[in-house]
Amino acid sequence: MFSPLIDQLINSLRHLPGVGPKSAQRMALHLLERDREGAQNLSEVLAKAVEHVHRCQQCRTLTEQALCNICSNARRNRKELCIVETPADVIAIETSAVFSGYYFVLLGRLSPIDGIGPKEIGMDVLASRFAEGEIEEVIIATNPTIEGEATAHYISERAKAQGIKVSRIAHGIPIGGELEYVDGGTLAHAISRRQEI
Amino acid sequence: MFSPLIDQLINSLRHLPGVGPKSAQRMALHLLERDREGAQNLSEVLAKAVEHVHRCQQCRTLTEQALCNICSNARRNRKELCIVETPADVIAIETSAVFSGYYFVLLGRLSPIDGIGPKEIGMDVLASRFAEGEIEEVIIATNPTIEGEATAHYISERAKAQGIKVSRIAHGIPIGGELEYVDGGTLAHAISRRQEI
């Protein structure tokens, strides 16, 4: 309905997650009518990010440096390694400020049906870190989904084979949550994994 | 929290309307983890759009051509001119398929407090179209806000001075709407502007 170039921009904006045709139209017109500088800036930063952002050599998170901020910080605890699925998970745990070790980002989870095997989640890199002998505890923080649990199981077997202690983050009722509003699956898990006090 | 370039990308994405810090983070990671081609494409189309999209010489809507699709269509009704605030309004009216004349896009509305006067809404261009003598009816479809009404009043005075018939689109209860859920302002307007049947 718009001119070809504007239609093309609307279509390109739909690559963004959670953006449907109406939002994409609103975004395109907003940028062109009122924020051309912002549009120009977004275009340049996007191109730069696509060109320069790659995976951290050590933990596989996304970064434009050879080593990410966390891996290049020598003052963290070398004995603990936390394994997560995505870079956003690293930020979530960092924000909670309870973990001072290093991370390893799988950038996915084992899912044979989607063709994601040990190689795709960087198991070779992870195995060589296990073999270095510096790590004393591996904390597995993959999501509590079927694939996440399978991934956790697979990694824990590999770590235990190297004599490393393995733990899984706790799942149950969120702090401040009310039982009444918690889903059945979580509640069942919380009861079966109850701990003596 | 992320590496500088990723943080910069997240900030740039916040220029998009309706995108807060969480959505911007999700968008940035989605593009970098899973859709680099889409990101590259968006960057290129954005740069091209910022460079080439300007205002249609005749109706002031956004287009990369000298004249937009509608203005360059000689088979429309030259006697009717519909005045709207934004390019999105043109598309909305075109979709309803009840109007076959030409448009004029103000790209805003009179708002002295924001420094938007007759010049900013292209009143000089519009006045010269009124003066051409081809237009028989001007349909004013600015939004029913205080500024939109003031703009409608101002334009109608200018058009009437040239002997052109002026009309305003109808405001009232939306078709298919239920009185119970219509706001008081709309209901008051609908009652005071009731029409004999």
From Swiss-Prot, chains A, B:
Any one GO BP annotation for this protein: DNA recombination
Cited SMART domains: TOPRIM
ZnF C4-type: positions: 56-71
Domain Toprim residues, every copy: 79-174
Keyword annotations from UniProtKB, A to Z: DNA damage, DNA recombination, DNA repair, Metal-binding, Zinc, Zinc-finger
SUPFAM superfamilies in the cross-refs: Recombination protein RecR (SSF111304)
Matching HAMAP family: RecR (MF_00017)
Protein family per UniProt: Belongs to the RecR family.
Function: May play a role in DNA repair. It seems to be involved in an RecBC-independent recombinational process of DNA repair. It may act with RecF and RecO.
NCBIfam families: recR
Protein name: Recombination protein RecR
